[in-house]
Amino acid sequence: MVPFSNGSGCMKLPDLNEARKRSSKDILIKTNEYIVKENLKELGLGKKYYIKTYGCQMNVHDSENIKAILEDMSFTETDVFEDADLILLNTCAIRENAHNKVFGFLGRVEHLKQTRPHIICGVCGCMAQEENVVNEIRDKYRWVDIVFGTHNIHNIPNILAKSMERKEQEIEVFSIEGDVLENLPVKRDSKYKAWVNIMYGCDKFCTYCIVPYTRGKQRSREPKFIIDEVKKLVEDGYKEITLLGQNVNAYGKDLKINYKMGDLLRDVAKTGIDRIRFMTSHPWDFDDDMISAIKENENIMPYVHLPLQSGSDKILKLMGRRYTKEKYLELYKKLKENIPNVSITTDIIVGFPGETEEDFNDTLEVVNECKYDSAFTFIFSPRVGTPAAKMNDNVTEEEKNERLYKLNDLVNKYANLANQRYLNKVTKVLIEGIGEKGNLFGYTDTMKLVNVDGSEDNIGKIVDVEITDIKTWSLDGKIV
């Protein structure tokens, strides 16, 4: 971190060079690090907070922690942005589009502050870990009151208190990751599905990815804390948990015990939770023991998100992905052969620097072979500070858009085809709530969205649903 004096205090700014470092220092497991001082427990009394979350499931779960911390300080949540006394943007740094959305929303906050100047505005999450972003906020968005990073969530009470006392911008961003904190509170968004962090950070350093810089080095939680958390969720009536990490397949490799992701999956399955999911997976670390664990346990869902990124060996090497097209397809076939009815989805980037038409056709070839149930597709977005951002971006915007269109056309074809196999079949669906059109909605074990006709009494239950119609990205059905 870099100290910066603003005249009356010291700001802790992010430093990309520091964020690249990976120390050999042991990560400590701390069970009493988070605390709200007595004099801060009523700091938010009579005040409302609003959180807007961008990005991945890890960010969603971070926001659940932030909400609980704020409520420990007597703030109450509001869904109405204009009514809030505290507005926090929990940001994503993975693509430029996410940046633009955040700065666009900040414009709305600035306008609101003109009529309600007492409002506190904060930026947190992965964008707060980016040196260039924080410098821009410091120089051009002086009305943003607080900025804190992914490693500073536990210190929100003190950051807020300083800002409210000093009436000036407070920035606290640690570039080097902290220890694993086991006593952060959580206010879960759902009563039926829960996110459970099993690890933090990533050491893969794919050349296009900013996450290893914004989330720090890999740190696994100890198994006992994860299992105890899931047991408590079972006691509280939860039906489904998702084990979260930037690369869950690498879980345990930093622990000084012989305990890996396959072991964790088996132990979590023993808790009796109805449904277990995990994300995100890196093909490099997806071993046979993980596949066996999924196959052996009915409550581990037959759904795997397996990012491809590119089907070209040349581009995969430039991306630093550590596998070849052949190795990826070998893993894909193992999953299909060993896990009945498995649904596999993926991520694909088009227009990476150096991608030729031949490279792109290699990607289409893999999509044609794998026939994914779904795919998240993106045009390459250079992130400041990553090796790929310095590569010669020799693919024209026209070529990028043409390739994305062609890829999406193929992805849509296979998504629709994958859904066809559900028509007139009965499948189990966890009903999660009421959709925009007034019908119930939920997900199959294979992560298919289903719009369901039925009574609200079924919310929170796993029910049998007959699929009556299929669309490209969803299914329609009725409870039987």
At which residue positions do the language-model features occur?
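Terminal RNA-binding accessory module
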Residues: M11-A19, I35, K390-V480
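Proteins enriched for Cys/Gly/acidic motifs involved in redox and nucleic-acid/cofactor modification
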Residues: V2-Y251, D289, E326-K333, E337, ...
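Short flexible coil/turn linkers enriched for glycine and charged/polar residues
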Residues: D189-Y192, C202-K204, I300, S310, ...
